[in-house]
Amino acid sequence: MRCLAARVNYKTLIIICALFTLVTVLLWNKCSSDKAIQFPRHLSSGFRVDGLEKRSAASESNHYANHIAKQQSEEAFPQEQQKAPPVVGGFNSNGGSKVLGLKYEEIDCLINDEHTIKGRREGNEVFLPFTWVEKYFDVYGKVVQYDGYDRFEFSHSYSKVYAQRSPYHPDGVFMSFEGYNVEVRDRVKCISGVEGVPLSTQWGPQGYFYPIQIAQYGLSHYSKNLTEKPPHIEVYETAEDRDRNIRPNEWTVPKGCFMASVADKSRSTNVKQFIAPETSEGVSLQLGNTKDFIISFDLKLLTNGSVSVVLETTEKNQLFTVHYVSNTQLIAFRDRDIYYGIGPRTSWSTVTRDLVTDLRKGVGLSNTKAVKPTKIMPKKVVRLIAKGKGFLDNITISTTAHMAAFFAASDWLVRNQDEKGGWPIMVTRKLGEGFKSLEPGWYSAMAQGQAISTLVRAYLLTKDYVFLSSALRATAPYKFPSEQHGVKAVFMNKHDWYEEYPTTPSSFVLNGFMYSLIGLYDLKETAGETLGKEARSLYERGMESLKAMLPLYDTGSGTIYDLRHFMLGIAPNLARWDYHTTHINQLQLLSTIDESPIFKEFVKRWKSYLKGSRAKHN
């Protein structure tokens, strides 16, 4: 400083210091005004993390109707995320939650003169927490990330409408059922080893066969078979020495057991005969498949016996064994052993099992209405073990076996149709307050319709008249009112309606009625002019009713599930979004087989409700 003072006079020095001080003050003020505001990223204060998917049910998707409450109808499909440009000034995911240039202050928000919540004010704008918005307006949102940036995505609804294919045909894909996964629903206890179809626990933890679920199981696998590529099939045993297409795996035959290839005249082929006491290790075939998990084998037992499959799993690589036993026990789980009864199997039959489903249903077994969630999955099909005395043939593992599942459902429907043409539902159903309970043995028009759609497809594939005959007899309950053990109701003494739930008073459920009409359409188109006459008459009367009554289900912002508000004089039963999209999907299908403009008009309007549109007010 002394050196500087010696060279510069004091006036100049004072001016320099003053300028320096001024610059410092200006810079300080600028830094203060540009300071970044911390924008809340803690989702509990404004954003919801969980996705729009509710996932299995209407769906049947969701868990796929609570595979979503997961009971979402499986009409909704997860859509592939598309690349999007980052939001300008958005959140930086690299630890930064600062948004430059924003100023806000906390403000009290009085809601309907009832209670107060905290909001944020920025100039003339006021922002409310999304956790409040989503509950108040019943809307949906989630934070997603694109190229390192977070973006909030808002949706008025959670369910999607599928794109209608070309005109609907009775031998084609059934609606969007290729997206249904009935067996993974938590209200499906398991796939019965004896019957080969799902056992439901929706209205009772004991489990019961629900015709709607069984028909949907068949229709979903039929539709998947049409839309998916053919499965990869690995053949492990055909008992034919000359068959070079099979894997050269050897059987292990412990002491005291027997295994040989023998001729079977009834099949005109060789088969594998085995004798292995229950107390032995059993004869075993190494498999080692790590890609596919649908196992199939032909089996004939001469005594009590079992076929077991050892699986290496994702549960710390532990081995679990699924036993298919010649009894009628439904399912059991002990330690790491899962048991399914498959019946006596004293004549040749094919056993086809989804090892993923069988493993997960076993590990998740509970005494409640829902299977316990589990993350366990098979990693490898290690080996097959046979015990008892009997024969095996055609051991394969494949990617899928859709037609086996479809025909399991079709055959069950034929075997379990009663003398009145219906599939009685053997569980009590209470639809709601004001309705009398439906006691075990009731019919459902939705079950009749979807069963007909299943049987028609089985007939068209096989030309086996037993399927068509069963479908024709299934029209009988359509003709009788609920008081006479039928499914028919009449609205305002004029419009015939086929009840999903034939309650007293009538409930007029919309989606079940439309499924019943689709079944009648499939039958009238397949059976021909003479045999299909009754189905045609029932279908035409039902379509007249639908066209007349459709406006009753429109709220101006969504749809109504049934007409209990009219029949009971209570609040309307609004359709969840997955049921709303089911209504749209059904109308889309009907619009391809009926040229009435009403269907396309309602489809257009009901689709707009999914994006928040509302009918005009006065």
Swiss-Prot record:
**Subcellular location(s) per record:** Golgi apparatus membrane
Pathway given for this chain reads:
Glycan metabolism; heparan sulfate biosynthesis; Glycan metabolism; heparin biosynthesis
Is Membrane included in the keywords of this UniProt record?
yes
Q: What is its EC number?
A: 5.1.3.17
* Stretches of the chain found on the membrane's Lumenal side: 30-618
Recorded GO cellular component terms are: Golgi apparatus; Golgi membrane
The entry describes its oligomerization and partners as: Homodimer. Interacts with HS2ST1.
Q: What is the lineage of its organism?
A: Eukaryota, Metazoa, Chordata, Craniata, Vertebrata
Q: Which gene encodes it?
A: Glce
How would you summarize where this protein is expressed among tissues? Widely expressed with highest levels in lung and lowest levels in spleen.
Recorded hits in PANTHER family, A to Z, give: D-GLUCURONYL C5-EPIMERASE
- Residue positions annotated to bind substrate are 180, 185-187, 202, 210, 213, 216, 430-433, 500-501, 511, 515, 561, 564, 573-582
User: Per the record, a Pfam family?
Assistant: C5-epim_C
Binding positions (Ca(2+)): T238, E240, T269, N270, D393
* Molecular function as annotated in GO: calcium ion binding; heparosan-N-sulfate-glucuronate 5-epimerase activity; protein homodimerization activity; racemase and epimerase activity, acting on carbohydrates and derivatives; UDP-glucuronate 5'-epimerase activity
Organism field: Mus musculus
Q: Per its UniProt entry, which superkingdom is the organism in?
A: Eukaryota
Q: Which reaction does it catalyse?
A: [heparosan-N-sulfate](n) = [heparan-N-sulfate](n)
Give the record's family classification. Belongs to the D-glucuronyl C5-epimerase family.
Outline which residue ranges sit on the Cytoplasmic face.
1-11
Q: Which UniProt keywords apply?
A: Calcium, Golgi apparatus, Isomerase, Membrane, Metal-binding, Signal-anchor, Transmembrane, Transmembrane helix
Q: Which residues cross the membrane?
A: 12-29
Q: What is its main location?
A: Golgi
Q: How does it sit in the membrane?
A: Single-pass type II membrane protein
Identification of the protein by name: D-glucuronyl C5-epimerase
NAD found in the keyword field: no
Q: Where is this site: Critical for catalysis?
A: Y180, R187, Y561, Y579
